[in-house]
């Protein structure tokens, strides 16, 4: 029930933002002549609420904390029980990613993520707060606490779309790109064998 509601929410969200996928940024003529140069972005663009996401950060130095309202590192084996018997079935790791160069936009097209931008003559790097599944050393990704006699299970990354400064076909623009935000358990019933 929850997963179907989540799927519907994602579909409606994607349809709602489809008309506003690429908000173009102002790029100077010199930057258009030299596409490898660092684009200068108008700081007023960051005042618009629709461009802000707690999972995207522009900073001149690496962030040392999780975003506001974030969940941080979620490792079931190292946490104290905080939720009175409620445990995560998939171990996950959350980190700020600063070396993202390529991403998939909401249209399914691969775009180039701008690693650096100039904001008020300060070179800032674009960081993304991503949560991915923690792979155990054995390589298995079975969900924890699932009855393996009756269920097949594996942990997989779940995604969302966030606004990021990207370049595609020589146009610098805000685009919705896909990032990893959770590690979820996928279940399927084992076939009944007599």
UniProtKB/Swiss-Prot annotation:
Record keywords: Cleavage on pair of basic residues, Disulfide bond, Growth factor, Secreted, Signal
GO cellular component, as recorded: axon; dendrite; extracellular space; synaptic vesicle
Region described as Disordered: 56-81
Signal peptide positions (record): 1-30
InterPro entries tied to this protein: Cystine-knot_cytokine, Nerve_growth_factor-like, Nerve_growth_factor-rel, Nerve_growth_factor_CS
Primary subcellular site in the record, as a coarse category: secreted
PROSITE patterns: NGF_1, NGF_2
Pfam family, one: NGF
Gene3D superfamilies on file: Cystine-knot cytokines
Molecular function via GO: growth factor activity; nerve growth factor receptor binding
Disulfide links within the chain: 90-155, 133-183, 143-185
Single GO biological process annotation from the record: neuron projection morphogenesis
Domain of life, source organism: Eukaryota
Compartment(s) where it occurs, according to its Swiss-Prot or TrEMBL record: Secreted
The UniProt record lists the keyword Secreted: yes
Disulfide bond in keyword set: yes
Propeptide position ranges: 31-79
Family the UniProt entry places it in: Belongs to the NGF-beta family.
Summary of the function given for this chain in its UniProt record: Nerve growth factor is important for the development and maintenance of the sympathetic and sensory nervous systems. It stimulates division and differentiation of sympathetic and embryonic sensory neurons as well as basal forebrain cholinergic neurons in the brain.
Assembly and oligomerization: Homodimer.
Protein's UniProt name: Nerve growth factor
């Amino acid at each position: 029930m929850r997963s179907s509601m989540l799927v519907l929410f994602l579909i409606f969200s994607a349809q709602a933002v489809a008309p506003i996928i690429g908000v173009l940024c102002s790029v100077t003529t010199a930057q258009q002549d030299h596409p490898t140069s660092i684009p200068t972005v108008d700081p007023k663009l960051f005042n618009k609420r629709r461009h802000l996401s707690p999972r995207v950060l522009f900073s001149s130095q690496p962030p040392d904390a999780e975003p506001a309202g974030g969940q941080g590192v979620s490792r079931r084996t190292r946490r104290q029980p905080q939720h009175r018997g409620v445990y995560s079935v998939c171990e996950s790791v959350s980190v700020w990613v600063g070396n993202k160069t390529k991403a998939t936009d909401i249209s399914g097209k691969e775009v180039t993520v701008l690693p650096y931008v100039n904001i008020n003559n300060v070179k800032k790097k674009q960081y993304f707060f991503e949560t991915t599944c923690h792979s155990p050393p054995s390589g298995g990704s079975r969900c924890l606490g699932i009855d393996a006699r009756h269920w097949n299970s594996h942990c997989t990354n779940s995604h969302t779309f966030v606004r990021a400064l990207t370049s595609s076909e020589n146009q610098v623009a805000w685009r919705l790109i896909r990032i990893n935000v959770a590690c979820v358990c996928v279940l399927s019933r084992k076939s009944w064998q007599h």
